[in-house]
């Protein structure tokens, strides 16, 4: 069972602005699973996230850690948003 109290996969070398961008993206992913979210909002936060997390390897590591603790996949959320292209998405369980 996934705990509702989980930690976010953050890099201690990130500055406050970087942490804010990463947390915003992870929060948008949470909204996609728990409610619904505008595709543009999720993709915009993903673009900002990618300015901080440039390597695919680090992105995959963050996705794995976040999915392990929260049950939410950043990869699946972005994939769904890219396929939808506009409007809203909801990945609720």
UniProtKB/Swiss-Prot annotation:
SUPFAM superfamilies hit by this protein: BH2638-like
One Pfam family recorded for the sequence: UPF0223
InterPro entries: BH2638-like_sf, UPF0223
Family named by the database record: Belongs to the UPF0223 family.
Protein name: UPF0223 protein SAG0995
Native source species: Streptococcus agalactiae serotype V (strain ATCC BAA-611 / 2603 V/R)
């Amino acid at each position: 069972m996934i705990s509702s109290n989980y930690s976010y996969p953050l890099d201690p070398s990130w500055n406050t602005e970087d942490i804010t961008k990463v947390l915003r993206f992870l929060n948008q992913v949470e909204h996609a699973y728990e409610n619904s979210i505008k595709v543009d909002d999720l993709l915009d936060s993903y673009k900002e996230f990618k300015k901080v997390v440039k390597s695919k390897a680090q992105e995959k590591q963050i996705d794995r850690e976040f999915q392990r603790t929260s049950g939410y996949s950043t990869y699946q959320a972005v994939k769904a948003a890219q396929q939808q292209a506009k409007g809203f998405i909801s990945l609720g369980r």
